A protein has these predicted regions:
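N- and C-terminal low-complexity/disordered segments
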Residues: 2-5, 9-14, 30-139
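Bacterial N-terminal signal peptides
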Residues: 17-27
Length: 139
């Protein structure tokens, strides 16, 4: 039996068609998986003062503000994976810089999602402070 070459129609049926079908099914199966997040009530964050090299842990309940230096940190939503899933925590955080001058309006320096698994991508980078999400919890 002659061996099909890459230009023959037999090559498409024998080699490429099953390969394409497997790739399609793998993509479909990956998109069918659902990710479960549980609502959290408290976000635990790590705050670094770059001037003094002081590292602090902030516990911020959802809907309440906490202050670190001149920053006001407000967690608007907090969620985490259940224990049987891959560890991941997410929080929607708004951070405002109050500054030292009371006559100047506070400036919003961060508004968005922070993820504990990707601190380099989703952390606040400020000239004086860094803030990253450590965890979200139900209590």
């Amino acid at each position: 039996m002659p061996r099909p070459n890459s230009h023959s129609p037999g090559f498409m049926r024998i080699v490429l068609a099953p390969t394409i079908a497997v790739m399609f099914l793998a993509c479909f199966a990956a998109s069918a998986q659902t990710t479960i997040f549980l609502d959290g009530r408290v976000a635990t964050m790590q705050a670094l003062d770059k001037i003094t090299a002081r590292i602090s842990t902030l516990s911020a309940p959802v809907g309440e503000s906490r202050q670190f230096g001149t920053l006001e940190v407000t967690v608007q939503r907090c969620a985490f994976h259940p224990p049987e899933e891959t560890p991941e925590n997410a929080a929607f955080v708004v951070i405002r810089d109050l500054g030292y001058d009371q006559s100047v309006a506070p400036a919003e320096v961060f508004s968005g999602w922070m993820f504990s698994s990707s601190p380099a991508i989703s952390a606040l980078e400020h000239p004086v402070y860094d803030i990253t999400l450590l965890a979200c919890s139900a209590d």
